[in-house]
Each structure stands twice: as structure tokens, then as C-alpha cells.
UniProtKB/Swiss-Prot annotation:
Binds 2 Zn(2+) or Co(2+) ions per subunit. Zn(2+) 1 binds at H62, D95, E158. NCBIfam families: dapE_proteo, PRK13009.1. It comes from Shewanella loihica (strain ATCC BAA-1088 / PV-4). The active site is at D64, E129 (proton acceptor). This is Succinyl-diaminopimelate desuccinylase 2. InterPro entries: ArgE/DapE_CS, Bact_exopeptidase_dim_dom, DapE_proteobac, Peptidase_M20, Peptidase_M20_dimer, Peptidase_M20A. Its cofactor is Zn(2+); Co(2+). Catalyzes the hydrolysis of N-succinyl-L,L-diaminopimelic acid (SDAP), forming succinate and LL-2,6-diaminopimelate (DAP), an intermediate involved in the bacterial biosynthesis of lysine and meso-diaminopimelic acid, an essential component of bacterial cell walls. GO terms for biological process: diaminopimelate biosynthetic process; L-arginine biosynthetic process; lysine biosynthetic process via diaminopimelate.
């Protein structure tokens, strides 16, 4: 609990780190880790491991948090890390400073009980997860790949649980990509429609065509692909003017069965099929995020190991899920690295009065302790 509050009291609003990683690094050095700090365009990153071998197990997380919002709506100051009636309240209580603190405490106590593991362990920490995520985990993974030091297994402390720590784990995430589509018509007077080209009518055709696209329906452990229009703008409203331009924004969440290039090609083919004219459509893609999916190959898979640790502590198995938004798991996952996300109940993430029960922090700590014993050798 002391570690949770130590991190939460540092106002590390993305991409600021506010000294969190310096404090983490000092604790890790005391345990025998070799720690490296990196700064990249205002982002703080940390890599720690026992030696230069590729890690058997990596523990990953982020020190940055989202802004607290309206301070007057908080029950307690958002960076005071206040304890009230068995709850820890403050920004980062769930997402994800308590998760990082649990990882740190679990490793520290494991070493105190069993000594240093024979396997190499690793910490991968960034302050650029809640923001653009361009200069954080992505760059750390690139550094490890260049050194042939990608970990075999990686557990991310993202808040994945529903009601109790360990009841849900993430075994992947859908990919995501946004698009900004501009349609060019011809402005005119509504009384003379033959002299105008209504860009909103063009937009209606486009949206109807996009909605009619058939995607995969998903599976038991992976939601299907979904396209949602998020914004339509035809400029300032005047009821006697035919709009000459219109902007449509949409977002696609897609399964690992698709590639980003495949998604783009399918949307372009759909637009080309409308024959609106080459100069009538301008399409710009934004904020692409790749999907990832970890599969259970055998008894030594990371899923099996995490399930066994959870069962040891809770006497129940977790639900395997890929729901929710994107995470840094997409950067960590590779043919060399299996990734699982395991954390606290996520009901209050990014909310005013973000909070977590102390009992859930203890429960998650016990799960991580059980997991670490499986990677000692």
C-alpha cells in the first residue's frame, strides 16, 4: 500500500513522469536489477533486468495518468492518495499505479523469500501510454529487438478485472484506426438544386455504403470488427444554403484476422464503388493501432501459467477477454513474446474519484506472487 501511495502522490499527467520512474528505479536497483532510463521527446522510459539474456518474464506498465478533470468534483484531492473506508482514492489508483506497485512489491517479496530467480526478469515502464503512445513502449520494444532481447512472456498490469482481481484477463485487443473523410460538392441556393451538388447527400450515400459492409462476427474470445461513424460536419448552418462540403469521421475496431493495410484497401474500394468522382473525396487515416492475440498453445503457454496462478489464489479460473480499448500490449506482442494483461477492477478508470478497494490490491498482489513462483527457474 505504501508503494501505491508513493506513486499516486506524484502528478504524472501524460506524458509527465513526475519522478515515478526514478523512484521505481531506485527500488529495482536495491533488488539487484540493472536499470536504464531513457528520455525521448519529453517521454520517460525505464528498462530493468537482472542480466543481458532475453528475459523469461517481463512485467510492463505505465506511470502516466489522464488529467483529473474538474477538481471540485473530487471527494479528495486527486493526487493525495487518500484512504477512505477501505478504498484508495486518487488518479492512478486503478489505471495503473496500484498495478505497478503490486508488481514491484511482489518481485521484492519473492526475492526476499526465494532469492534471485535463475531466469532473467525484466521491467518495461513508460510515461507515454495514455497519450500518443509514440515514444514509449514502442521505442523500448524496438530497442530490445535490436539487441535480440525480446522477452518470452510479458504481463501488463492494465486494469482488466470486472468485479474482482483475477476474474478477467486480456489475451489480446482489437486493432483500431480512425479516418477523416472530406466530401467536396458545390454550394448553392436550396431553391436552385440543379445548380448545386449537395455534399450532405453525398455523405449519406457514403455512410450507407460503409454501414452495409459485412465484417467478421468474431468468436467467443474475440469481438468482431465494427465500423462506427463518430462525427459529421457540413459547416455553419443556414437553412437556404446547399452545403458544398462535408466531413465524416469514423473509427474501425478490427480483429487480428485483418491487417491495417487490408482495412484501408477495403474502405477505399467501397468509396471507389460509389463513383462520386476522383476529386470529390479526400480520405486521411489517423491513429492506427495494431491488434494482437495471444493463443494457448500448450501447458507452458502464458495463458496457462496465469490461469494456474489465479486458480491457486481464488479457486476459480478467469474469463479470457479481448474487449475494451487499445493498450501497449500491441507493441509488446510479437512472434517471440506472449502477452497477457492482468490487473484490478476497471469500473472507475479515467473517472472523477477513481478508486479501488484495498482488498483487491491485496488479491492482485497474491496472484502476482503465485505467478512469479512459476518463473523462478
Amino acid at each position: 500500500m505504501r508503494y501505491c501511495r508513493e506513486l499516486m502522490r506524484r502528478p504524472s499527467i501524460t506524458p509527465e513522469d513526475a519522478g515515478c520512474q526514478q523512484w521505481l528505479g531506485e527500488r529495482l536497483v536495491a533488488m539487484g536489477f540493472d536499470v536504464s532510463h531513457y528520455q525521448d521527446k519529453g517521454v520517460s522510459n525505464l528498462l530493468a533486468s537482472f542480466d543481458e539474456r532475453p528475459a523469461q518474464l517481463a512485467l510492463a506498465g505505465h506511470t502516466d495518468v489522464v488529467p483529473p478533470g474538474d477538481l471540485s468534483r473530487w471527494q479528495t484531492p486527486p493526487f493525495a492518495a487518500t484512504l477512505v473506508d477501505g478504498m484508495l482514492i486518487g488518479r492512478g489508483a486503478v489505471d495503473m499505479k496500484s498495478g505497478l506497485a503490486v508488481m514491484l512489491a511482489a518481485v521484492e517479496d519473492h526475492i526476499a523469500c526465494y532469492g534471485l530467480p535463475k531466469a532473467n526478469w525484466q521491467f518495461i515502464v513508460t510515461s507515454d501510454e495514455e497519450g500518443e503512445a509514440e515514444h514509449g513502449t514502442r521505442t523500448l520494444v524496438e530497442r530490445l529487438k535490436a539487441q535480440s532481447r525480446l522477452p518470452k512472456y510479458c504481463v501488463v498490469a492494465e486494469p482488466t478485472a470486472d468485479k474482482q482481481a483475477g476474474d478477467v484477463i486480456k489475451i489480446g485487443r482489437r486493432g483500431a484506426i480512425s479516418a477523416r473523410l472530406t466530401l467536396k460538392g458545390k454550394q448553392g441556393h436550396v431553391a436552385y438544386p440543379k445548380n448545386a451538388v449537395n455534399a450532405l447527400h453525398m455523405a449519406a450515400r457514403v455512410m450507407q455504403a460503409l454501414e452495409a459492409l459485412i465484417w467478421d462476427e468474431g468468436s467467443d474470445d474475440f469481438p468482431g470488427t465494427s465500423l462506427q461513424v463518430t462525427h459529421v460536419d457540413s459547416g455553419a448552418f443556414t437553412d437556404n444554403i446547399v452545403p458544398g462540403s462535408c466531413e465524416i469521421c469514423f473509427n474501425i475496431r478490427y480483429s487480428y484476422r485483418y491487417s491495417e493495410a487490408g482495412i484501408m484497401a477495403r474502405i477505399q474500394a467501397c468509396l471507389d464503388g460509389l463513383s462520386l468522382g476522383e476529386d470529390a473525396i479526400s480520405l486521411r487515416w489517423e491513429r492506427g493501432c495494431q491488434p494482437y492475440h495471444t493463443q494457448e498453445n500448450d501447458e507452458q503457454s502464458l495463458i496457462a501459467q496465469v490461469e494456474a496462478a489465479i486458480f491457486e489464489v481464488t479457486a476459480s479460473f478467469p474469463r479470457l477477454s479481448t474487449s475494451g480499448g487499445t493498450s501497449d500490449g500491441r507493441f509488446l506482442s510479437s512472434p517471440q513474446t506472449q502477452v497477457i494483461e492482468l490487473g484490478l477492477p476497471n469500473r472507475t478508470i479515467h473517472q472523477v474519484n477513481e478508486r479501488v478497494e484495498l482488498a483487491q490490491i491485496v488479491r492482485l498482489y497474491r496472484i502476482y506472487r503465485a505467478l512469479l513462483t512459476r518463473f523462478h527457474d
